[in-house]
Amino acid sequence: MTQVMNKPKKPKIISGIYRITCLANNKHYIGSSDNVMRRLKTHERELEQGSHNNRKLQHDYDEYGSGFFEFRVVFVDIPKEKLTAYEKVAIYLYDSIVMYKGYNDIWPTTNHKMFKEAYQDLLEKGLIPNREN
């Protein structure tokens, strides 16, 4: 008699944009990765260990604790070559630059045309609100 062993399925690797939110102050950190689940787990591990490279994010994590943080994927299946443009759109949408209400230190480098294309794509898919109206 032959037994078939089911191998555990590997999680699907998803590219996209993610958001880390401090629920205590509604500040956001936006990032992108060609493997968002792995990247979010890395952020969570670094914050737990007190070794995250974003000092403001680490400070608030230490102050409020893990229960006040949400780790979420916001846009999925973004082509690798377009990740930076979509990340920039998300930073814009969530006002996550430090001088506003967020943890991102800088805007990702991308040209304005790519930003507009990414913004329009998300708008057409109904994934973001139209800020023009």
Task: Label each residue range with its predicted role.
Residues T2-E132:
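Structure-specific nucleic-acid interaction/processing domains
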